[in-house]
């Protein structure tokens, strides 16, 4: 029996064994959000893109909860846990139903790009309704319970949550692909990082999504301090780091830190994205 099929091994060991059987081209294909099937291993294609900020209604009928900013206004941690439970239950049901029919299209997977724990500092920001407000403390407390509800506490993760957008991503929306957010270390650690730290160290969130913008001069999807020193170094994050949609393209088209798509991809991969 191939090592990657041995259920006595950990998921990490099986994934590593499978990766060892793939060519460089096959491995690269798996980095796309719409990863193709690996037929020789009997694995179907998988689409990593699913949303779950306040429901999973993009793939059929589902419970639509109020926007995140409205949920947060209740200041109810237990409610946030229950909301997360419902969302992941419905996501799991949709996934199971789709899988029976070989449907691996967008919004059918178990990787939910939620919650958005950015700090809603400026009310003119167009995505503030996705957040839990302007205060890092309730954002942290509510975010932890939401992630715990999404991921569950069973031997197999119910669905995977993703803390986004790391970090200092709170507008201006029209410039998100090119602006450079300048934040002092004091502001970073008092305002913008506490919620991410809580979700990683307390809730064991499975994924973190990098923001489009730069923070203090470096793209958030290839940021040594944020990704290597803080996330994986200080907080010991062991999950996967994903870019926001097509954010790597911004490296050479807007941030001008690289010249070609190949250079941008290499920069992101070498940084751990």
Language-model segment annotations:
Residues 1-273:
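Glycoside hydrolase catalytic-domain context in secreted enzymes
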């Amino acid at each position: 029996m191939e090592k990657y099929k041995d259920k006595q091994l950990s998921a990490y060991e099986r994934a590593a064994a499978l990766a060892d059987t793939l060519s460089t081209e096959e491995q690269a294909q798996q980095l796309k959000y719409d990863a193709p099937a690996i037929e020789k291993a009997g694995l179907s294609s998988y689409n990593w893109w699913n949303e779950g900020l306040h429901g999973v209604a993009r793939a059929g009928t589902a419970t639509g909860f109020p926007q995140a900013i409205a949920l947060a206004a209740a200041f109810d941690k237990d409610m946030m846990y229950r909301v997360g439970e419902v969302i992941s239950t419905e996501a799991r049901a949709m996934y199971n139903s789709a899988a029976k029919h070989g449907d691996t299209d967008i919004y059918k997977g178990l990787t939910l790009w939620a919650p958005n724990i950015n700090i809603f500092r400026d009310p003119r920001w167009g995505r503030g309704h996705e957040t839990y407000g302007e205060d890092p403390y309730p954002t942290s407390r509510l975010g932890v319970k939401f992630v715990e509800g999404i991921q569950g506490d069973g031997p197999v993760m119910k669905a995977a949550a993703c803390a986004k957008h790391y970090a200092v991503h709170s507008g201006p929306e029209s410039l998100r692909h090119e602006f450079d957010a300048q934040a002092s270390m004091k502001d970073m650690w008092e305002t913008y990082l506490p919620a991410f730290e809580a979700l990683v160290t307390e809730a064991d969130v499975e994924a973190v999504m990098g923001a489009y913008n730069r923070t203090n001069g470096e793209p958030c999807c290839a940021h040594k301090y944020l990704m290597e020193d803080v996330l994986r170094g200080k907080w010991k994050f062991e999950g996967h780091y994903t870019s926001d949609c097509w954010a790597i393209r911004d490296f050479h088209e807007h941030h001008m830190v690289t010249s070609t798509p190949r250079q941008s991809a290499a920069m992101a991969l070498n940084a751990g994205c």
